[in-house]
Amino acid sequence: MAAEGAAVRDETGRTYAAAAVALPSLQMSALHLAVAMAASSGAATLEAAALVSDGPGPNADDLAAVRDLGPAAVVFHAAPDGTLLATLRA
């Protein structure tokens, strides 16, 4: 699995950051974990999400997780050097 980090911003401006988890019994993408952290903290909606990865951009499941809390959220995908690779709609 490619190393990755993600962050999401909720409607109040709070930011939740996460890194991918790859344990034998638990695997979660950075974007999934950031959305889960926002949801468990009581966020009502998401305004934006960002994924930094040396691998491919967010997959359909990542985008669906963002869409669950932020149907209009913009998702940015960047390389580790900060180069913006894609701007997507959840």
PLM ranges: what are they?
Residues 23-37:
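A short, polar/charged loop-to-alpha-helix boundary motif
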